[in-house]
Amino acid sequence: MPREGLTLRCETCKMENYITKKNKKLHPDKMEVTKYCPKCNQHTNHKEKK
């Protein structure tokens, strides 16, 4: 199955907050979304963990 799990990490504090899935065949680039970080107590950019 092409859909694989990945972890999203906060760019500010480097805390791993979210686990999600994506289809790596259709979207080979790293995912970047704005999500809430409980440690920073604000919305920050979260990038796909390496």
UniProtKB/Swiss-Prot annotation:
Q: Which GO terms describe its biological process?
A: translation
Which GO terms of the molecular function aspect are on file? Answer: structural constituent of ribosome
Alphabetized InterPro entries for the sequence: Ribosomal_bL33, Ribosomal_bL33_CS, Ribosomal_bL33_sf, Ribosomal_zn-bd
* An annotated GO cellular component: ribosome
Per UniProt, which keywords does this protein have? Ribonucleoprotein, Ribosomal protein
Could you tell me which cysteines form disulfide bridges? none
User: Protein name, please?
Assistant: Large ribosomal subunit protein bL33B
Q: Which family does it belong to?
A: Belongs to the bacterial ribosomal protein bL33 family.
